[in-house]
């Protein structure tokens, strides 16, 4: 924890609607201040419908459209991903000057704090799935998120 609190937004085994996830996030923003809360929605991507192996591979991170604090958080995560996945594809989109992909995903658009969504490789890519199921792959995913967050916090505290 390194002195910071974290909370699993969806501890239930059931699928929780996005509106409830946003409500929970924004309740934390109200309780602690939106600049003291970040949201990282962690996913595994898919390129197909699950009926066959696909060729898409790689790690990526999404923010909502426009330049926000979320873009800086995403850039910190990208830097950690490049370090932790040296032999894996890192999917980037520099069309707006930074590496993250921008989409109007509900959870990113409606959360009041810095919010990103990571896609940690592809579950329907044989090579990505093997990597995700390996001890090294799991640790690299954890390290990427932890190091990206810590870098964002370090930079955030140096700009205060």
Where are the model-predicted features located?
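Active-site-proximal helix/loop segments of hydrolytic enzymes
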Residues: 1-160
């Amino acid at each position: 924890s390194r002195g910071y609190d974290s909370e699993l937004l969806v501890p239930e085994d059931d699928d929780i609607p996005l509106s409830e996830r946003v409500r929970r996030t924004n309740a934390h923003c109200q309780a602690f201040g939106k600049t003291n809360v970040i949201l990282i929605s962690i996913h595994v991507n898919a390129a197909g419908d699950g009926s066959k192996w696909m060729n898409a591979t790689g790690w990526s991170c999404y923010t909502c459209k426009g330049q926000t604090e979320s873009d800086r958080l995403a850039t910190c995560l990208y830097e950690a991903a490049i370090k932790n996945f040296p032999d894996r594809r890192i999917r980037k989109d520099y069309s707006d000057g930074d590496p993250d992909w921008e989409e109007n995903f509900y959870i990113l658009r409606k959360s009041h704090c810095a919010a990103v969504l990571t896609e940690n490789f592809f579950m329907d890519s044989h090579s990505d799935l093997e990597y995700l199921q390996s001890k090294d792959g799991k640790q690299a995913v954890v390290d990427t998120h932890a190091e990206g967050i810590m870098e964002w916090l370090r930079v955030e505290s140096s700009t205060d």
